[in-house]
Curated annotation (Swiss-Prot):
Membrane topology summary: Lipid-anchor
Chain segments annotated as transmembrane: none
Taxonomic classification: Bacteria, Pseudomonadati, Pseudomonadota, Alphaproteobacteria, Rickettsiales
Gene from which the chain derives: omp
Database matches in PROSITE patterns: PROKAR_LIPOPROTEIN
Recorded family membership: Belongs to the rickettsiale 17 kDa surface antigen family.
Protein name: 17 kDa surface antigen
Compartments reported by the entry: Cell outer membrane
GO CC terms of this entry: cell outer membrane
Amino acid sequence: MKLLSKIMIIALAASMLQACNGPGGMNKQGTGTLLGGAGGALLGSQFGKGKGQLVGVGVGALLGAVLGGQIGAGMDEQDRRLAELTSQRALEATPSGTSVEWRNPDNGNHGYVTPNKTYRNSTGQYCREYTQTVVIGGKQQKAYGNACRQPDGLWQVVN
């Protein structure tokens, strides 16, 4: 399960970094494919044991990548900006279990971030587990991750 958690964290980090990329960076469909693949792998890992579980991870990753790519293709720069601002606000000041929503009035895309458990890591930083859900073109995608508060006050996805 640790491997799958790392996959999800890497995918979320790539998604958040995508918001900072210029024209030469990964496109929104690539980001969606990465997120979907990681989410599918996590879901697939819940089925079977041993080799059967590995097959579940592979199939889940493939199906998630296809769906995630389609959803990612529908996210624009404003969607990513709104998602990132909402993530920062939710992680900083929202009680565990309470969702904070974002909505792009121009295209109807929306999502929400739900911070969960708060803890301190081995270096003393405050960290939070969270769930992030986006609905793009009527299709929902959900991801799980951990983020830690940096000295500058911003939250950063960690692995």
